[in-house]
Amino acid sequence: MARVKRAVNAHKKRRVVLERAKGYRGQRSRLYRKAKEQLLHSFVYSYGDRRKKKGDFRRLWIQRINAASRANGLTYNRLIQGLKAAEVEVDRRMLAELAVSDANAFAALVNIAKAALPADTSAPAAAAAPKAAKVAPAAATATAVKAVVSEKPAIDGAVAADGDEAPEGYAIKGNAESKKYHVPGSTWYNTTAAEYWFSTVEAAKAAGFEPAGGEARQQIKN
C-alpha cells in the first residue's frame, strides 16, 4: 500500500492557522501550536462579543438621545413615551444619528413628543381613556348595593348612613364601593366612612357585603 505523507495538506492547514494568527504577538503568530491555541480562545471571545456588541451600541444610542433630548427640555423616558403616543416609528439608532448630525430634525421630533404627552405625567396617553370608562362600573356597583339594602321588603338590621353618627343599635359599618363591612375594633373601622350601618354581621352578609380582611378580622369582641 502506498505511503501517504500528507505534506501538502498539512502545510496548507498550518498556513491557514498562521495566516489567521498573524496579528498576535510573539510565539502566538509564529508557532503553529501556540497560534492554534490562541485561535480557539479568540473564537470564543468573538462569539460572545458579537452578542455584547448589540447591547453596547444600544446603550451608546440611549446616551446620545438622552443628552440631546435634555438639551431640548425633555428627558429620554418622556421622549420615548411621547413618540410612542404620537405613533412616530423611529428606532433608537436613527434618533441617535439625528441627535449627532441633524439637531433641527431632532428638535422637531422632541416638539412632536411634547405635544403628544398626556397632562398627567404618571399616566400614558393611551391608558387615559380606558380609566374614564371604568368609572361607570363602579357607580353601577354602588347603585346595585343601595338597591339591595333599600329594596322592599327591607333587610332587617340594615340602614343607609345619614351623617357620621351611628344609629342606635347599628354599629357595623358598610362601604358600598368595596362591598366590605367593618365591625367595631377592627383594623380599618375608624378610617372607614360608613355608607350603610348594620346591626349584625348576618345583616351585612345578607346585604351582599363581605368581611374586610377575612372573617378573623371582623369578629365582634364582647
Swiss-Prot record:
In terms of superkingdom, the source organism counts as Bacteria
Q: Which GO terms describe its cellular component?
A: ribonucleoprotein complex; ribosome
Pfam family for this entry, one: Ribosomal_L20
Q: Give an example GO biological process.
A: translation
Which keywords accompany this UniProt record? Ribonucleoprotein, Ribosomal protein, RNA-binding, rRNA-binding
Q: Which GO terms describe its molecular function?
A: rRNA binding; structural constituent of ribosome
Question: Which HAMAP family is this protein grouped with?
Answer: Ribosomal_bL20 (MF_00382)
Protein family membership: Belongs to the bacterial ribosomal protein bL20 family.
Outline what the protein does: Binds directly to 23S ribosomal RNA and is necessary for the in vitro assembly process of the 50S ribosomal subunit. It is not involved in the protein synthesizing functions of that subunit.
Q: What is this protein called?
A: Large ribosomal subunit protein bL20
